[in-house]
From Swiss-Prot:
SUPFAM superfamilies: 2Fe-2S ferredoxin-like
Function: Ferredoxins are iron-sulfur proteins that transfer electrons in a wide variety of metabolic reactions.
Keyword Chloroplast: yes
Keyword annotations from UniProtKB, A to Z: 2Fe-2S, Chloroplast, Electron transport, Iron, Iron-sulfur, Metal-binding, Plastid, Transport
Lineage: Eukaryota, Viridiplantae, Streptophyta, Embryophyta, Tracheophyta
Compartments reported by the entry: Plastid, Chloroplast
Domain 2Fe-2S ferredoxin-type: 3-93
Organism: Alocasia macrorrhizos
Annotated GO biological process: electron transport chain
Protein name: Ferredoxin-A
Length: 97
């Protein structure tokens, strides 16, 4: 399946289609969208965002605990969309504050 991903970035909103087996960060790069990242393995907070709407599967990640994920935190480098989704990006400072 393919889902609509809307990213709310400091530079404005970006929308694209993302297959359910492609990480959101990878697909964003394919679309020419510049997002922050570091490890690309779900073990740091550089790419952190907040899911505002919809669902993701980020079971490949290890940095976030269950409580953070329940609050909507997402690591875009290990997140697959499982529905149409809206994500606020560039949230590392807020997450680690």
């Amino acid at each position: 399946a393919t889902y609509k991903v809307k990213l709310v970035t400091p530079q404005g909103q970006q929308e694209f289609d993302c297959p359910d087996d492609v990480y959101i960060l990878d697909q964003a790069e394919e679309e020419g969208i510049d997002l922050p990242y570091s490890c690309r393995a779900g073990s740091c907070s550089s790419c952190a965002g907040k899911v505002k709407q919809g669902e993701v599967d980020q079971s490949d990640g290890s940095f976030l605990d269950d409580e953070q994920m329940e609050q909507g935190w997402v690591l875009t480098c290990v997140a697959f969309p499982t529905s149409d989704v809206v994500i606020e990006t560039h949230k590392e400072e807020e997450l680690t504050a």
